[in-house]
Amino acid sequence: MSITVLFPTATEASLFQHPRVQTVISGVGLTATAHQTSKLIAQHRPDWLILAGIAGVYPHAGLAVGEVALVASELEGDLGFFTPQGFTHLAHLPLDMDFARRHTLHCPYVDAVSGFTLARGVSLNAAMAPFIDTSAVDIENMEGAAFFHVCLQENMRFLQLRAISNVALPGEDDWDMAGSVQALTDGLHRLLAQLGA
């Protein structure tokens, strides 16, 4: 079985090693992740593609810094327009245009593993953007929606694992980078063992 793990940064990958798993640094953000995910699928098409990184947690979510979550859904949160009523997601705008109105993307493979808390993610180009409705999500990151979209379009089996590094609030500077990277690494080894790696 071939498995590739994408990490947005070398920092997030720094503690991970596995003799039967390929690792790739995708780069931070939606654009870099879409490119690297597409490239990996086109050139290698592994049996599983996993995105692993840190994430911020919203105060209303039932997760704490240092916990690990399997991401069940993703939303590209800042895709839309500012209207007189405020920010409106592109999927909810009454535009007379013919295009795919995608909002929330779901991972159909989360049942392949067990023992992980499931989280709803939002991907943002601008972290902690104040105009985003976060009531229906738990965590934020900068890559997940692009990863989900490419994998779904290409019929690629995929999972996303995130370790909570901080509370996603402006001015909340109490990050646990070292602890979250360790938690991510430990969680990734548990996940890979369940996949048979």
Residue ranges and their predicted role:
Residues 1-4:
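Extreme N-terminal starter segment of soluble prokaryotic enzymes
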Residues 6-10:
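Structural motif
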Residues 11-196:
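Glycine-rich phosphate- or other oxyanion-binding loops that anchor nucleotides, phosphorylated ligands
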